[in-house]
Amino acid sequence: MTSRERAESKVGITGMPGVGKTTLAMEVANLARRRMTVCGFITLEVREAGRRVGFDVYDISTGSRVPLARVGAGAVTVGKYVVDLSACDVIKRILDAASCDLLVVDEIGAMEVKCPNFLVSLEKAVKSSPRVLAVVHRNYLDVAKRLGIEVLWLSRENREAVREEVLRKLGLPLA
């Protein structure tokens, strides 16, 4: 792979719940920060007394964190979670302002897709970013393909190999 191809890499990771997709995305973002500007968002689990009760959106650029979804009843739901549409404004702002060497999107999934204009903002951000690392829910692989994101399957067994491949494709050292 040439340096130009590496400089324009758009890589996705998918896999079953709990295999470490978000952990890998955070690890790559932290490694990349040593060499380049990184922007985007990570969807973090919120736990209380050891039980998952929701998700927050973490803005990589600012370090701010806002609620995305919580267990409960409401108008916009994904499974047992109610999506906080005010978080959609934050996600849109993050994507619309994306101007960095590596855009991290965690995730392209059901909660994010519930946000009005998410896919429009996502497409613009992906097309304008030289490097992209996206966590892609397995039900949204078609979206990743349409955006030119090459998706790798992550499992507990291949975690280290996928990590190395992601770093290589993004032009980062195998640290």
From Swiss-Prot:
Please give the start and end residues of each transmembrane region: none
Give the main EC class.
hydrolase
Enzyme Commission number(s) from the entry: 3.6.1.15
Q: List the disulfide bonds.
A: none
Pfam families hit by this protein: NTPase_1
Please verify whether the record's keywords include Nucleotide-binding. Answer: yes
- GO MF assignments: ATP binding; ATP hydrolysis activity
This enzyme catalyses: a ribonucleoside 5'-triphosphate + H2O = a ribonucleoside 5'-diphosphate + phosphate + H(+)
Q: Enumerate the Gene3D superfamilies for this protein.
A: P-loop containing nucleotide triphosphate hydrolases (3.40.50.300)
Residues annotated to bind ATP? 15-22, 102-109
Q: Which UniProt keywords apply?
A: ATP-binding, Hydrolase, Nucleotide-binding
The family annotation for this protein states: Belongs to the THEP1 NTPase family.
Summarizing the function annotation, the protein's role is: Has nucleotide phosphatase activity towards ATP, GTP, CTP, TTP and UTP. May hydrolyze nucleoside diphosphates with lower efficiency.
Q: What is this protein called?
A: Nucleoside-triphosphatase THEP1
Q: Which organism is it from?
A: Pyrobaculum neutrophilum (strain DSM 2338 / JCM 9278 / NBRC 100436 / V24Sta) (Thermoproteus neutrophilus)
* Source lineage: Archaea, Thermoproteota, Thermoprotei, Thermoproteales, Thermoproteaceae
